[in-house]
Amino acid sequence: MELGKTKRVHIVGIGGAGMSAIAELLLKSGFGVSGSDLSSGEVTEKLAAHGATIYLGHQASQVEACDVVVYSSAVKPEDNVEIAAAMQAGIPVVKRDEMLGELMRYKSGICVAGTHGKTTTTAMVATMLIEAGESPTVMIGGISDYLKGSTVVGSGKYMVIEADEYDRAFLKLTPTIAVLNSLEAEHMDTYGTLEDLKKAFVAFANKVPFYGRVICCADWPEIRGIIGSLNRLCTTFGIDEPADVSATDIVMANGRTTFTVQAFGEVYPGVSIAVPGRHNVQNALAAFATGLELGLDPARLVHGLGCYSGMRRRFQIKYDNGRGLLVVDDYAHHPSEVKATLKAARNGWPSARIVAVFQPHLFSRTREFASEYGWALSRADMVYISSIYPSREKEEDFPGVDAGMVAGAVTKAGGKHVLYVSDSGELKRLLLEEASAAGPRGTILLFMGAGDITAMASEVARCGEKENL
């Protein structure tokens, strides 16, 4: 890959999921990469091991040797000294999605969009293509067990990308195949209304060339509603609604899901994926439909889905004591994702006591969806709510908004056992008590959220292993 005379790229916020993935892609493509972030960790250490120069904190001098500066939507350009220094020095400054769009020029793009399921579906497509011998280039906003990372630089013609709708980023991409996995109200700080969000999805899908294809989930009403606005060829997939590609005979047991695919009059039995939940069957159908559109052998698609081994923080089992105690970490942070994750746990382990540990993400999202979170979480046997993870927001901008709103909504929705625990040490103590008290019916400690609740899941898992809970 070449980007004119560009040899060295500096990335502001390099430790984020999306930014670290593009950093890894650039490194593997032969570019020099430097980057800055406010904290270090496993991700930045891995990038450093691959040759990136990592800076802790932001300083103007750190951009002096670069040819371009890339930043994410989470970074405010007007508040960042590195971006200001680059602009003053005449160094080009671009958003991540613009850089990604440029890199896509060299490949045939398969872009997976949707409010939910983007990461998993992208990884499933990538796994299938690799197993089919296609050697794709891949970039996912998460860590794939199969890929052992978030990026792959392949020699084949396909580039598989997770397409993020936040800040309208996906409108800079150039897909040949666009997957619309799901669609409902989200990122209202960007879009303002659901109608505006739907228009953005239509614009994204219509970026597909006349010879391409849009793969649409028929189970989502909002996606069904926009199909008529697409001026491109469409393939539909789904479970509950009539579709070109559908699933029957769905069976969930011990964390795996098996089913039969029916596609365009043909039947493909024996599909098995290493993750629970009907939502993951939908994700697999999206991947299968994509493979069919590429003309791949259906037998290889079935095999490829069987090789999919999950994603970090997507119903990731962190600890299994073999006696019924599971510690599970999941990225679910939207009410629909929380609902689907809890349903997957209930269907996969019907007799287990489900203890939900939820960290609300963003004050704005908590304010908007407190009631919906309550209904979703009320399905658990016990619910613990931690403090809100603010991410890019400031608490003082949202007076009166706290995680207690979610706890109250759980009670209002019929949840009988819920605790809002703001102190992380106390929360850990209570969860270890839950683990120690796990009985013969089994207990699932299900951690959910897009913030640092994942660290708590890891701590509890480590304690479980150390103390043989």
Swiss-Prot record:
Give the residues the record marks as binding ATP.
114-120
Give the EC number(s) under which this enzyme is classified. 6.3.2.8
Predominant location of this chain?
cytoplasm
Q: Identify the domain of life.
A: Bacteria
Subcellular location as annotated:
Cytoplasm
Per the record, its GO cellular-component terms are:
cytoplasm
Q: Which terms in the Gene Ontology molecular function aspect does this entry carry?
A: ATP binding; UDP-N-acetylmuramate-L-alanine ligase activity
One BP term from GO: cell division
Q: Which Gene3D superfamilies match?
A: Mur ligase, C-terminal domain (3.90.190.20), Mur-like, catalytic domain (3.40.1190.10), NAD(P)-binding Rossmann-like Domain (3.40.50.720)
Look up the record and name the pathway of this protein. Answer: Cell wall biogenesis; peptidoglycan biosynthesis
Q: Which UniProt keywords apply?
A: ATP-binding, Cell cycle, Cell division, Cell shape, Cell wall biogenesis/degradation, Cytoplasm, Ligase, Nucleotide-binding, Peptidoglycan synthesis
Query: Which reaction does this chain catalyze?
Result: UDP-N-acetyl-alpha-D-muramate + L-alanine + ATP = UDP-N-acetyl-alpha-D-muramoyl-L-alanine + ADP + phosphate + H(+)
Q: What does this protein do?
A: Cell wall formation.
The entry's family comment says:
Belongs to the MurCDEF family.
Q: What is this protein called?
A: UDP-N-acetylmuramate--L-alanine ligase
Q: Specify the species.
A: Chlorobium phaeovibrioides (strain DSM 265 / 1930)
- Whichever gene encodes this chain, its name is murC
